[in-house]
Amino acid sequence: MSGKSRVLRRILLLALAVYLICSVAAVQVMNAALFGRADEPKELTVRYEDVAADYPRQTVTFSSGSAQLTGWLYPAEDAAALVVIAHGLGADAETYLPETMHFVDEGYSVLTYDATGTGASGGSGTRGLAQSALDLDAALTRAEQEDLPILLFGHSWGGYAAAAVLGGSHDVTASVCAAGFDTPLGLMRQTARRWCGPVAELGVPFLWLDQQLRFGAAADVSGAKAAAASGVPVLVLHGSDDGTIPADGPSLLAACQKENAPNIRTVLLPGETHTSLLHDAQGRCSEAVFAQIDAFYAAALADGAG
């Protein structure tokens, strides 16, 4: 081997080593930044102690993998169904008190919970994007004890979960998925590109491998494909001005539009952001959006009863 060949080989090996080290380090930094513990958000539009007298609840616990999750059951008299709410990443169950109260007022019992690594639940961190579906699956096992038709409501991280779990064994009457993403890897890839630019594509194989090691087959679940294959009525909502999960990017809405399944209805909400599509800064639920959700749930329950 000539001197030039040896030098070239060393340069290539060094470049490969740098690539491997930087890619692995970048994935670890990303995980640490995104998936640490998520304790109570600093800013809540409504706090439970302010509404406890009007919305009594009981605390429930159940396991999701090795984590013990804490949830709350809000019973409604002569409830027509049980709404299970899956929250977003960095939020917790109490973040969605406006939605919880709305559903109770509409005559539904509601089950909320803090996901793994969040709020009152166990876990050293939230683990990753696929964890939301695993936690919702565990919550549904607890929800089935109430012996009521089950309706799902998920936002963002929970919006993905409310679609992804439809590929499982639980009997779900209908699901509303707001501002969700289609696949964990798709959103991780977009986030990496946002942070690092096009060079982030070099690290995608390591993102994929990390997800496989953490979650196995659960990392590959497409919310859109699971929803389409289930036949369950699904309402997918997304804001046109969502900067967190762009509607025309790795969103559940875009993927569901490609699936074009008859059981899925997609609604793009003009001018709405990642959170404003549900409630405003004062905690008031969007009347127009929740009128659609209420009608959707009522129709699904009527069809199920027929």
Please describe what each predicted stretch is.
Residues 126-146:
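Alpha/beta-hydrolase active-site loop
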Residues 230, 236-238, 242:
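Short beta-strand/loop motif that positions the catalytic acidic residue
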Residues 8-63, 72:
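An N-terminal hydrophobic leader/cap segment in hydrolases
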Residues 103-122:
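Conserved alpha/beta-hydrolase
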Residues 259-306:
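C-terminal catalytic histidine-bearing segment of alpha/beta-hydrolase fold enzymes
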Residues 164-216:
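Hydrolase active-site cap/lid region
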